[in-house]
């Protein structure tokens, strides 16, 4: 269902100058919550941007009726530190510092340099490039440096 929602609202969000990072539908305290997270290629995602996007996509979601039950719509930034789960997440996080944990228990910190549908390339501290297929990644998390 979230894939259909992404397809419906992704173009609308892009027409406003932002990028759709993720859509998730969760149940919290017996209430369905639809979370839409954004990336602003020109800077931060402000509260005004979240409100603007929410006001535009809310009626669209109501008309499409993808979610049968009542739900709360939450629109937010993708966050400074987040787990990368899909090729899209990797592509939208190029140039960021990440902590990488592999399925073979190896771990390292690097800069995410490239990503495609099968793998991601990481630049290590010695400037070497390490290419890893997604299937070999256990967890990749962006790191925010103060």
Curated annotation (Swiss-Prot):
Major subcellular site: cytoplasm
Xref: Pfam families: DUF150_C, RimP_N
Key word Cytoplasm present: yes
GO BP terms: ribosomal small subunit assembly; translation
Recorded GO CC terms: cytosol
Keywords for the protein's UniProt record, in alphabetical order: Cytoplasm, Ribosome biogenesis
Domain of life: Bacteria
Coiled coil, from the record: none
Keyword Cytoplasm attached: yes
InterPro entries per record: Ribosome_maturation_RimP, RimP_C, RimP_N, RimP_N_sf
Cellular localisation: Cytoplasm
HAMAP family: RimP (MF_01077)
PANTHER family associated with the record: RIBOSOME MATURATION FACTOR RIMP
Family, similarity comment: Belongs to the RimP family.
Function recorded in the entry: Required for maturation of 30S ribosomal subunits.
Name of this protein: Ribosome maturation factor RimP
Species for this entry: Helicobacter pylori (strain ATCC 700392 / 26695)
Gene that produces this protein: rimP
């Amino acid at each position: 269902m979230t894939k259909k929602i992404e397809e419906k609202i992704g173009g609308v969000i892009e027409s406003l100058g932002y990028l759709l990072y993720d859509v998730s539908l969760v149940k919290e305290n017996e209430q369905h919550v639809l979370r839409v997270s954004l990336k602003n290629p020109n800077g931060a995602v402000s509260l005004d941007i979240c409100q603007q996007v929410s006001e535009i996509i809310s009626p669209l979601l109501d008309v499409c009726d993808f979610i049968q039950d009542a739900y709360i719509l939450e629109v937010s930034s993708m966050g400074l530190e987040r787990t990368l789960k899909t090729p899209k997440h990797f592509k939208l996080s190029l140039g960021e510092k990440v902590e990488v944990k592999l399925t073979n228990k190896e771990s390292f910190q690097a800069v995410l340099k490239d990503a495609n549908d099968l793998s991601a390339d990481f630049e290590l501290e010695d400037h070497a490039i390490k290419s890893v297929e997604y299937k070999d990644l256990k967890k990749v998390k962006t790191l925010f440096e103060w």
